Amino acid sequence: MKYRLGDARVETHPDSWIAPSAAVIGKVRLDAGASVWFGAVLRGDNELIHIGEHSNVQDGSVMHTDMGYPLTLGKGVTVGHNAMLHGCSVGDYSLVGINAVILNGAKIGKYCIIGANALIPEGKEIPDGSLVMGSPGKVVRELSEPQKKMLEASAAHYVHNARRYARDLVEDPA
């Protein structure tokens, strides 16, 4: 569900999709093929939250900003279930694992995997092509080319799945 907050309106591309139980509020922009899944909350009450083309925010994830810390997902980003992102940027074709936390001012490069339950502290910069694990998150190695292709496939799968849900999801009161 989209909500206006004062003059701040959610901007959606016609090819984006928001699940009925998601809450997308205020200064939020979804590009073509972007999707926000069930129970996710994107609260753009301070700064812009920009969800790039073909990016997906999965079930239960929370995104928020502080003044001076907008939140940006590049192209083809996958944000796993129950992740929490706050005032950060995530580069193209990166994956944020289940329950991962990324804090204000952190910058995740392109083609990165932030492992499940990882914590990326404020202001931390992660180089392109990194696998990050732990709390606090540490680069454990570089991704292989097949792993990078898997990140592209993950994003493409969610674009296809969102289109299927937009077309076929019907409330069933029975």
UniProtKB/Swiss-Prot annotation:
<dbReference type="InterPro" id="IPR011004">
    <property type="entry name" value="Trimer_LpxA-like_sf"/>
</dbReference>
<dbReference type="Pfam" id="PF00132">
    <property type="entry name" value="Hexapep"/>
</dbReference>
<protein>
    <recommendedName>
        <fullName>Uncharacterized protein PA3753</fullName>
    </recommendedName>
</protein>
<dbReference type="InterPro" id="IPR050484">
    <property type="entry name" value="Transf_Hexapept/Carb_Anhydrase"/>
</dbReference>
<dbReference type="InterPro" id="IPR001451">
    <property type="entry name" value="Hexapep"/>
</dbReference>
<comment type="similarity">
    <text>Belongs to the gamma-class carbonic anhydrase family.</text>
</comment>
<dbReference type="InterPro" id="IPR047324">
    <property type="entry name" value="LbH_gamma_CA-like"/>
</dbReference>
